[in-house]
A protein has these predicted regions:
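N-terminal active-site beta-alpha-beta segment that forms phosphate/nucleotide-binding
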Residues: 2-118
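Charged helix-capping and loop-helix junction motifs
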Residues: 66, 138-142
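Conserved beta-strand segments that form the floor/walls of ligand-binding pockets within enzyme
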Residues: 50, 102, 122, 128, ...
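A residue-level signal for conserved active-site and pocket-lining positions in enzyme catalytic cores
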Residues: 14, 51, 75, 123, ...
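Internal, well-ordered alpha-helical segments in soluble enzyme and binding-protein domains
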Residues: 10, 33, 142-143, 176
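Short glycine-rich anion-binding loops that position phosphate/pyrophosphate groups of nucleotides
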Residues: 55-57, 127-131
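Surface-exposed, charge/polar-rich loops and edge strands
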Residues: 1-5, 16-19, 107-108, 117-122, ...
Length: 187
């Protein structure tokens, strides 16, 4: 099986695994994930944080965004652009729309834009990941092109335990992350 075929299989399995979580498991796992990230030094020290609006069963970082704003941090969100580019945008109160791929996205004209080198922490979704911080995304390479430009940021993946694989199928151009935080339901 080629790397492309392996990625497709891992992507499909990871999406199915996260969608298979019950509402209770998802709620508990999201809460645990956000609490773990909030306890990290990189979160405590960060001023500008790139989050994402959860889509298709992704780990939901909404509680983290609320807490970041409460602490005076600046939560930004990715906006997909031409040429598979990303822009980090801090939306205003009426600055949201449904963007590419049906994802809730900031409206650039109503948002403050942060340069990649202004970000202190970047939280990245995935469909599958492994123990050595490699990830399989949705397949367009947006984050793989963006992350190298985030020169001072800690880059963390956010996912559910059910999305873990033994070895993520990656190519040379796939960006390795600094770590992963995993949502695990607990009793």
């Amino acid at each position: 099986m080629t790397i492309t075929e392996q990625k497709a299989a891992q992507r499909k399995a990871g999406i199915a695994a996260r969608r298979a979580l019950s509402d209770t498991e998802r709620t508990r796992s999201n809460a645990a994930l956000c609490a773990r990230i909030m306890a990290l030094d990189c979160f405590k020290k960060a001023e500008n944080i790139l989050l994402y609006a959860a889509f298709g069963g992704e780990a939901d970082l909404s509680a983290l965004a609320v807490e970041a704003a409460r602490q005076g941090k600046t939560p930004a969100y990715p906006v997909c652009g031409e040429g598979f580019s990303l822009t980090a945008a801090v939306p205003g109160p009426d600055g949201w729309e449904v963007g590419a791929y049906g994802i809730r996205t900031p409206i650039l004209s109503r948002s403050e834009i942060l340069r990649p080198d202004q970000l202190d922490l970047v939280l990245v979704p995935c469909t599958a990941f492994d123990a050595v911080c490699r990830r399989v995304g949705m397949g367009k390479g947006y984050y793989d092109r963006y992350l190298p430009r985030c020169t001072r940021a800690v880059k963390l993946g956010a996912a559910f335990e059910a999305q873990r694989v033994d070895a993520a199928a990656v190519d040379a151009h796939d960006e390795k992350l600094d770590g992963f935080e995993i949502g695990r339901a607990s009793c």
